[in-house]
Design a protein with these regions (language model features):
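Catalytic cores of Mg2+-dependent Asp-rich isoprenoid enzymes
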Residues: 1-157, 162, 166-277
């Protein structure tokens, strides 16, 4: 199996919405974004699937060394072998790839966030940076496009946090800011014990409104001349925002279920967004 095939398998196996946005890219850009996404999956799985925290830290440290070595032409993993040829072509910065690893390590260091600023820092590491790297691969001609991608990544992560509140709580992680839980009278025990209430719905409506605003702010930043090149990101946005709308329409019943879109619906949204340009 070639490095590119390994990354393709990694990306397709995840069933992620991101995979659908890659379908319409030219081959070279598709290989680059697939390698980037495979890297994100590798380091994310390191934290999510490793039951021993010390081993997870060792693996993340290995990835830091591997990324640094990749920028010197010394890569050993199929993902870095697939990603390395694209570093210069798409101006992919080492600091951004390392920041993603830092974000994964944050999940080992803390399970609660005091306020929105603290949660936003986490979102920047695990999602906004990915947005910046992705936009560079898609083709960004303006600094404003990278700002758009940074904000869009933030909106994606806010959507993930809303969708996965119950699942994350069962893993011992609560990303919703402590001060906002207190503001709406919702406790950590409510989340852990899946106590759906009017207060919880109000809390989630507040979170949803903020995520919707983040999408609007992102779209307002995208320069017209880059809109066509950034269609993959817009496809992701169409899928993620539809998911957010579904969560809201379902009354925020996210404590006991994980709401998702069917593959055929994702494909339809991808095609519709691509055609509209």
């Amino acid at each position: 199996m070639s490095p590119d095939e390994y990354c393709q398998q990694k990306a397709a196996a995840s069933g992620s919405s991101f995979y659908y946005s890659f379908l319409f890219l030219p081959p070279e850009r598709r290989r680059a974004i697939t390698a980037l996404y495979a890297f994100c999956r590798e380091v994310d799985d390191t934290v999510d699937e490793c039951t021993d925290e010390s081993i997870a830290r060792i693996k993340l440290a290995w990835w830091r060394t591997e990324i640094s070595g990749m920028y010197q032409g010394k890569q050993s993993h199929p993902v870095t072998q697939a990603l390395q040829p694209h570093l210069t072509v798409y101006n992919l910065q080492e600091q951004h790839l390392l920041a993603i690893i830092d974000g994964m390590e944050m999940d080992l260091n803390q399970t609660r966030y005091l306020d929105y600023a603290a949660m936003s820092k986490y979102c920047w590491h695990v999602a906004s940076v990915v947005g910046i790297l992705s936009a560079s691969i898609f083709g960004a001609t303006s600094p404003e496009t990278l700002k758009y991608a940074e904000k869009l990544g933030h909106a994606f992560q806010l959507t993930n946090i809303i969708r996965d509140v119950g699942e994350d709580a069962r893993k011992g992680r609560i990303y919703l800011p402590i001060n906002e839980l207190q503001q709406f009278g919702v406790t950590a025990a409510d989340l852990l014990n899946a106590r759906h209430s009017e207060k919880f719905e109000q809390l989630m409506a507040f979170q949803c409104a903020r995520a919707q605003a983040a999408y609007d702010e992102a779209f307002a930043l995208l320069p017209k001349q880059d809109r066509r090149a950034q269609r993959p990101g817009l496809i992701m946005a169409a899928i993620y925002r539809t998911l957010l709308n579904e969560v809201q329409a379902d009354g925020f019943h996210v404590l006991t279920q994980r709401i998702s879109l069917t593959p055929i619906r994702k494909l339809w949204l991808a095609w519709k967004t691509y055609v509209r340009g």
